Amino acid sequence: MTDNAPITFDGKRFAAHLSMAPGVYCMYAADDTLLYVGKAGALRKRVASYFNGTPKNTRLTAMLAQVVRMDVTITRNEAEALLLENQLIKSLAPRYNVLLRDDKSYPYVLLTREAWPRIALHRGPQIVPGRYFGPYPGVTAVRDMLNLIHKLFKLRSCEDSVFRNRSRPCLQYQIGRCSAPCVNVVTHDNYTEAVRRVTLFLEGKSDLLAEELIQAMQVASEHLEFEQAARLRDLLTSLRSMQNRQYVDGRAADLDVLACAALSGHACVLLLSFRDGRNLGTRMFFPKTNGEERTAEILSAFVSQYYAEYPPPPEILLDQEIPDHTLLEAAFSRSSAHKISLRWNVRGERAGYVELAVRNAQVALSTELTSQRAQRVRSEAVRQLLGLEEPIKRVECFDISHTMGEATVASCVVFDAVGPVRSQYRRYNITGITPGDDYAAMRQAIERRFRRAVEEDKQGERPDVLFIDGGAGQLAQAKMALNAVGVESVLLVGVSKGEERRAGHETLIMLDGQELHPGAASPALQFIQQVRDEAHRFAITGHRARRQKTRMTSKLEDIPGIGSRRRANLLKHFGGLAGVKAAGQTEIARVEGISTALAAKIYASLHGLSKSDAVNASRVS
């Protein structure tokens, strides 16, 4: 294969081997960037539509030109595919989905955890303390449900800022949709009972709730409380007209489903998880094997190791019997608050879940093997480009990230011939240098990484090639760092984007000053871009986390009288430092543990005022 031969993707051939089952498909670029996530009622038909004929628009043309591989996940039905698609888009932010799709998340019903709980529709991060029911497939169903809950159970929907400042009942009370807990029209015991009934309703325990309502209705009738009995009758009628549950999948409760596929000495363990009846999607694991283990042995080893780290659900379904299952059940049950059951040869719906996991494990393994073959082609192209005699076993790449010298972080990512080795990634918090000095940061990071390897004599952890994100200056600093720790057998290569800073136009810089220009279509450059971009991603996420932590805590920690507990109360109350800074002194003083004098001190410190100026500002406001 020549060095400049691009890796092409035969979409028609890929689609021809897919099933007509519903599912989700993902498209990837050469550097493993996720381009697009979509759902399909019939995977083969939907995927084939992308590659039959001319693309309908320039966006689609541009996207398909970048595709080098695809993954698919089979689901039980299209509704599950819809939810899984949304979860992947929200968590992975594919390049083309972000531009084109509605970025709303699926709605939940939120029941807050307060003395007088509030019920409301909720989207987005689940940061408000309380219980979240869902996700639901559409907002209309949630609004209809909330309308029924307000009408029959009369829970409040107002924000706390409104609730705390009411002096008389609002319009919701007047039209019979709220019991006015804000002004104590309803007793706390009665309101708590209403909350309990709403919880049963949202949990899908309509039968249990109906029995309670029938008994309460009989008691009301016996006591001649006919209006109360009529209200309970209406509530019972409404309950029976509603579905027990409106989750996308509310049948599985809490359980994990595991299946193992093996081929050509490689294995894949697929985990399908359900929590509170919600399909959380799949995760794929590719354990290293010697090629001789049976799938049952691989699965047994996985179960033992995985659930030693993560708490198991009450029920774990397997695609086959595994060795030591009785021992594993006993061990898991002893360390858990509930009994753990490992099951196989199941029937009904659970058999369908196992079959689903088996099919997805087979597809995932096939896709992984194809991806590894492509990665080996790129790795071999790098070897040829750099003139190495032996196949590449390990490469590393360093990058630096900071904001105007603040919170500098260096990253080191590791790749072998078949892809990233994430367990060996490292970050280095850079200290003791002039802020913004990238050269000093690079030198410090490389010295720290290789000094440890030299001290521990870890020859196997030394890379064949060390890529540096930068030009000749950064490359020189890397060489100085290696010399300082006595490492000589590592090939250093700088990766420079040049003046135009366009992807595909990178220049590779060698220590002797030689420059290589592989070209955008080169598999070697595609491999190097993937490594470099991963180093950049890993550095910038570490930098942002460090910067956020510094900004969230240091300004409050510097204020006399603010300890860890008061700082936590402030950040929790206002949702972060930005919220504290935006608040007035009166609002700050309402936080638990914050006096009026301390609130003035906090306000002054965050706004660069003297304490007297802060007091005056408070009087003016």
Curated annotation (Swiss-Prot):
Domain UVR positions: 207-242
GO molecular function: DNA binding; excinuclease ABC activity
Keyword entries, A-Z: Cytoplasm, DNA damage, DNA excision, DNA repair, Excision nuclease, SOS response
One cellular component term from this protein's GO annotations in UniProt: cytoplasm
GO annotation terms (biological process): nucleotide-excision repair; SOS response
PANTHER family, A to Z: UVRABC SYSTEM PROTEIN C (PTHR30562:SF1), UVRC/OXIDOREDUCTASE (PTHR30562)
Family affiliation: Belongs to the UvrC family.
Subunit structure: Interacts with UvrB in an incision complex.
Function description: The UvrABC repair system catalyzes the recognition and processing of DNA lesions. UvrC both incises the 5' and 3' sides of the lesion. The N-terminal half is responsible for the 3' incision and the C-terminal half is responsible for the 5' incision.
Name of the protein in its database record: UvrABC system protein C
Organism expressing this protein natively: Xylella fastidiosa (strain 9a5c)
